[in-house]
Amino acid sequence: MPAKVYVNRTLNMKKIRYIGLDMDHTLIRYKSLNFERLSHTKVIEKLLKRGYPDVIKSLQFDDNLAIRGLVIDRDKGNLLKLNRYTAIRASFHGLKPLDFKMHQKIYRSTYIDLSTGGYMAVDTFFSYSLAVLYTQLVELKDSNPNLQFPEYARIADDCLDAVDEAHRDGSLKEEVKKNLDHYIIKDPKMVEDLEKYKKHGKKIFILTNSDYHYTKLLLDYAIAPFLKEHKSWLDLFEFVITFAQKPKFFYEGNRFLRVNPADGTMTNVEDKLAPGMYQGGNAKQFTTELGLEGDDILYIGDHIYGDILRLKKDCNWRTAMVLEELEPEIENNAKAEPINAEIEVLMKQKEPFEDELTVLMTRKIEEGVVDDGKIEALQK
């Protein structure tokens, strides 16, 4: 299926002066299953150091167990699927779906408020493997009461801490660095498109939370080999801002440091921002010194909160989101169209029977006219 762009608000690209890109999972796409398996393995290693039973070594990453957009109920050990109104459409405990009666008993008329401490959003690629592992650990805890597992909420917190630690201590990225071909997608067409935008007068910048060394490594690997109209990715990108600390970049006043692209050494920025490579900084200084309004910038990212919601709230930049899960969702909806059409036909056939049942029930209540045999037949 060819990649497509969907909009929920009109976007006139002629008015966009700067196009900003997150790096990880946006400009540079990962081979998701390989990366999530790695993340799953690293988190298990860290949980073992925290005293979790050795049996968790046997757990294998299963990408069918979760998807971004779900919510973890920390206290009950459940994985929840919400609708657009934050009502709960489906729930799983461990590896098993809760049956309808149990689901209704626990969650009837419940609307999820993610600002409360009882729930954890699965809203990034990095939390995807966390959700998979959490469901597996809940299953192990329930099926092995003799093993020393913490309570459900503690398991969720430990998994989150372990994921954060794996990113913070560099253990994940060190593995990626050792085998870039196994984890990173090369996309020559994407590089060609970026050069085309640059040719048409758009200025392109990178805004990433990754550090200088990792950023340079990935850009050298996935961008530089496919450049045709630029000598270096430094010529393609007007600004490369590393270690940006998003979402704080959008609302705090951290200072910019200029980075020497050759060796990563940093110096203070004394003058106005000029094209080049930087660390840190803040959105207010970036837009003010470049003479930009919020809607002059289109920023593309993959993090619902860190890249999209907070950015819209604080800076009014135009935003776009990379949502890989949308592609199979659209494909599945297309495959289901014949079934949906059949259901629609059957629903129309059902309508006159429902109308007749309503009339009979009304007459029974209001006029005492009883035709229980026909009512029973219609209710079947």
Predicted regions and their residues:
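HAD-like aspartate-dependent phosphatase fold
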Residues: 1-380
